[in-house]
Amino acid sequence: MKIRCLHDWNVSLEEAADIQRTLKGMLSFEFPAKKVSIVAGVDVSFPQKNLGLCVIVVMDDTLKVIESVYHTQEVHIPYVSGFLSFREGPIFIETVKKLKIVPDLFFFDGQGIAHPRGLGIAAHMGLLLEKPSLGVAKSHLFGSYNEPGRNKGDFSYMYNKTGEIIGTVLRTKKNTKPVFVSPGHMMDVDTAMSLTLKYTGKYRLPEPTRQAHILTQRLRKNHLLR
């Protein structure tokens, strides 16, 4: 899979913010007409202080897992809100290189454009891959919204400070906390929401990222990271 090199990773926070603002202008919000049949879910965690683990699970349109890969490496960039992709991006890229199947779409456990500078990890990584991407976050980072209804499929839009729609607050399971869905690259707001619902079963989170998280927990439990 082709991965574009658009910037350095070893940069200051000020430089990272400038990179985010620049890359934001390169995003496309047009979803390609090609049918989505193979999707990937991404989960990044830190089982040890300076050890990162990235898991990618690839599924077909029946939600069957057809490939899974993982990669570990040392990560010495600390977590700073709004700069997650600079901490997790390099390990994600190394994990993507292990894939034999090329997904049509990537789901990320994180933000797309619902981000202070419009470039969360889903948008950032989608741009590097030139692949459709979206973020489904468990918690709110940026944007104003009203609480959606309590039933599955209820939603409200998220807005940035200028009133532009940047995502949705989506109820994926009745009477549970909503998720925060925003487009990454080659994606629009409404398609991101409909795809999230399509790939969400009886649980709160979409199956691609849920299965990636399950594999992460299995790897850690089985001590495969030692």
UniProtKB/Swiss-Prot annotation:
<keyword id="KW-0540">Nuclease</keyword>
<dbReference type="InterPro" id="IPR007581">
    <property type="entry name" value="Endonuclease-V"/>
</dbReference>
<feature type="site" description="Interaction with target DNA">
    <location>
        <position position="79"/>
    </location>
</feature>
<protein>
    <recommendedName>
        <fullName>Endonuclease V</fullName>
        <ecNumber>3.1.21.7</ecNumber>
    </recommendedName>
</protein>
<keyword id="KW-0255">Endonuclease</keyword>
<dbReference type="Pfam" id="PF04493">
    <property type="entry name" value="Endonuclease_5"/>
</dbReference>
<keyword id="KW-0963">Cytoplasm</keyword>
<keyword id="KW-0479">Metal-binding</keyword>
<dbReference type="GO" id="GO:0016891">
    <property type="term" value="F:RNA endonuclease activity, producing 5'-phosphomonoesters"/>
</dbReference>
<feature type="binding site">
    <location>
        <position position="43"/>
    </location>
    <ligand>
        <name>Mg(2+)</name>
    </ligand>
</feature>
<feature type="binding site">
    <location>
        <position position="109"/>
    </location>
    <ligand>
        <name>Mg(2+)</name>
    </ligand>
</feature>
<keyword id="KW-0378">Hydrolase</keyword>
<dbReference type="GO" id="GO:0000287">
    <property type="term" value="F:magnesium ion binding"/>
</dbReference>
<dbReference type="InterPro" id="IPR053396">
    <property type="entry name" value="Endonuclease_V-like"/>
</dbReference>
<dbReference type="GO" id="GO:0003727">
    <property type="term" value="F:single-stranded RNA binding"/>
</dbReference>
<keyword id="KW-0460">Magnesium</keyword>
<comment type="similarity">
    <text>Belongs to the endonuclease V family.</text>
</comment>
<dbReference type="GO" id="GO:0006281">
    <property type="term" value="P:DNA repair"/>
</dbReference>
<comment type="function">
    <text>DNA repair enzyme involved in the repair of deaminated bases. Selectively cleaves double-stranded DNA at the second phosphodiester bond 3' to a deoxyinosine leaving behind the intact lesion on the nicked DNA.</text>
</comment>
<keyword id="KW-0227">DNA damage</keyword>
<keyword id="KW-0234">DNA repair</keyword>
<dbReference type="GO" id="GO:0005737">
    <property type="term" value="C:cytoplasm"/>
</dbReference>
<dbReference type="GO" id="GO:0043737">
    <property type="term" value="F:deoxyribonuclease V activity"/>
</dbReference>
